[in-house]
């Protein structure tokens, strides 16, 4: 009975000493890991990246510190293995082996960084999608500007053509009217004047013949009976004023008509020439009017072309930004994969250590 109590007391002391050793070793190990983690330069921000700004002396000190800490960890691990070997004889179902303390706190840090990078990757993916939509909208706007530019050019061309054709038609009509009036003056007034001139010439010829006949014919009337021996010679006979007026009155009337017709012809010719000049001037100004009406369409087309260039520039910038965002997302994804590989390696090391410990315990 005393021997059994002695064994129980020894086992109790052994458990207490083992727990104290385990607690002290865990505290020392945690401090060592904290020191190691303090030397890891890790910046977590919008784009978390690992940055190292140490010089050669600091790197040498850090390597020495890491080597020293590794030796401490190795000694603590050996001591822990010995303690576990001693505790293996006193284990009960209520006092099972707990190896959770063998996991480093760096795993939690790496997991947090991986989660942050995953959120960053999601944000970058959304940003890339939004930039792609912006690029698509800019391209669509550029296409619409091209369509509007074509419509403006088409409408301005149609407007200019219609204006030019309309003004040219008006001028041509005016010119045709002047030519028609000139032809009418030639057919009517000038022809009438020429006909009257011929009639006047015939009348003068007949009058001259009549005068010659009256002068050269013998005087048989009663007025010559009283002349007697003092009869006048034929060349001394003169016509009375009434006789001359009666003979020349048809010629005067014809000459007036001729003068009237010629004046009318000249006036009609001038009017026709004026219409022709107006028509030609109108047709010459049709090109200018067409260019003026087309200039508005060209201005609208230039504005649409400017909007098109702006839309194309916006689309190009959005595409470049989207490409940069995609590249950043891919880089973040690669970094996440590296962190996941590190976590996987840690888990495998932990499983291997646990298996080794279990094998040693069974041994």
UniProtKB/Swiss-Prot annotation:
Stored Pfam families: IpaC_SipC
InterPro entries, per the entry: BipC/SctB (IPR005427)
Entry keyword Nucleus: no
Record GO cellular component, one term: extracellular region
Transmembrane domains' residue ranges: 99-120
Record's subcellular location: Secreted; Host membrane
Membrane topology term: Single-pass membrane protein
Subunit structure: The core secretion machinery of the T3SS is composed of approximately 20 different proteins, including cytoplasmic components, a base, an export apparatus and a needle. This subunit is involved in the formation of a pore, called the translocon, in host membrane.
Task performed by this protein: Component of the type III secretion system (T3SS), also called injectisome, which is used to inject bacterial effector proteins into eukaryotic host cells. IpaB/SctE and IpaC/SctB are inserted into the host membrane where they form a pore and allow the translocation of effector proteins into the cytosol of target cells.
Name by which UniProt lists this protein: Type 3 secretion system translocon protein SctB
Organism (species): Shigella dysenteriae
Native organism taxonomy: Bacteria, Pseudomonadati, Pseudomonadota, Gammaproteobacteria, Enterobacterales
Gene name tied to this protein: sctB
């Amino acid at each position: 009975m005393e021997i059994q109590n002695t064994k129980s007391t020894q086992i109790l002391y052994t458990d207490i000493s083992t727990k104290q050793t385990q607690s002290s070793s865990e505290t020392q190990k945690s401090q060592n890991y904290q020191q190691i983690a303090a030397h890891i330069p890790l910046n977590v921000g919008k784009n978390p990246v690992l940055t190292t700004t140490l010089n050669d002396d600091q790197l040498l000190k850090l390597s020495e510190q890491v080597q020293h800490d590794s030796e401490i960890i190795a000694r603590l691990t050996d001591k822990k293995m010995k303690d576990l070997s001693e505790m293996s004889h006193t284990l009960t179902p209520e006092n099972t082996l707990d190896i959770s303390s063998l996991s480093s706190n760096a795993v939690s840090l790496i997991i947090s960084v991986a989660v942050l990078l995953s959120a960053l990757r999601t944000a970058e993916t959304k940003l890339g999608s939004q930039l792609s939509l912006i690029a698509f909208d800019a391209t669509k706007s550029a296409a619409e500007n091209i369509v509007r530019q074509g419509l403006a050019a088409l409408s301005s061309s149609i407007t200019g053509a219609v204006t030019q054709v309309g003004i040219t038609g008006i001028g041509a009509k005016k010119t045709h009217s002047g030519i028609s009036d000139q032809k009418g003056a030639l057919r009517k007034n000038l022809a009438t004047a020429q006909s009257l001139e011929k009639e006047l010439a015939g009348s003068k010829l007949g009058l001259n013949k009549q005068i010659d006949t009256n002068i050269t014919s013998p005087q048989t009337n009663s007025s010559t009976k009283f002349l007697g021996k003092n009869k006048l010679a034929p060349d001394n006979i003169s016509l009375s004023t009434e006789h001359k007026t009666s003979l020349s009155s048809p010629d005067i009337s014809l000459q007036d008509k001729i003068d009237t017709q010629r004046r009318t012809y000249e006036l009609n010719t001038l009017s026709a020439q004026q219409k022709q000049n107006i028509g030609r001037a109108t047709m010459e100004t049709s090109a200018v009017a067409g260019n003026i009406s087309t200039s508005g369409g060209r201005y609208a087309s230039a504005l649409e072309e400017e909007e098109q260039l702006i839309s194309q520039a916006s689309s190009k910038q959005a595409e470049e930004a989207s490409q940069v965002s995609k590249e950043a997302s891919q880089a973040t994804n690669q970094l996440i994969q590296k962190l996941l590989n590190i976590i996987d390696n840690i888990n495998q090391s932990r499983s291997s250590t646990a298996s080794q410990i279990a094998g040693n315990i069974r041994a």
